Amino acid sequence: MKQQQEQVLRSVAQEDIRLIRLWFTDVAGVLKSVSIDPGELEEAFSEGIGFDGSSIEGLTRVYESDMLLRPDAGTFQRLHTKDGTDVHGRMFCDVLTPDGLPSPADPRGALERAVQRASEMGFSVFAHPEIEFYLLRQPVDINHLEPVDQAGYFDHVTRGLSNDFRRKIVRALEE
C-alpha cells in the first residue's frame, strides 16, 4: 500500500470519519458520488469498488457495464455536514475497466493522458475550473426567479448588490 493511502486510512480512523464519498464525473462533467463505509476503504485502494458503468451517461454500454472506482488518496478531503455534527471523507476516483485498466471514457483519465502527451511534446498544461453563478432575489415562487440587478455578463457595475457581493467574494478568496 502506498504511503498516501496509509495516511488516509490513519486519518479516517483517528478522526472517526464514518462515511467515505467516492467522486467521479460523467462525460458531461456532472459530478457523481458513491458512498462507502470506512471499512471498505483499504479494499477500494487495492482492488477498486465495482459499479454499473452503464448507469452513467457516456461511460459504457450496457453489455460492458462492470466498472471500478479506485480512489486517489492525494485528493482526500474532510467534508463537514451542514450542521457540523459529522465529518465525511471524500476522494476523487479513477474509473477503471474490470481488468484494472484506465477507462477511455473517464474524463479525469482523459485529461491526465492529454497532459502526459503534451508534456512529452514539450508543452506545459495549465487548467482550472471556471466558477460561474447567478445572484437571485429570494424567490416568492421557485418557478419565477429574478436577478438582483439587470447587469449582464462582464458588465461594469459600480453600485448595487451584485458589486458588493463580488467584492466580498474577492476578499474572502484573498484570505
What function would you assign to each model-found segment?
Residues 1-175:
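Glycine-rich, acidic/polar active-site loops that bind/position phosphate-bearing ligands
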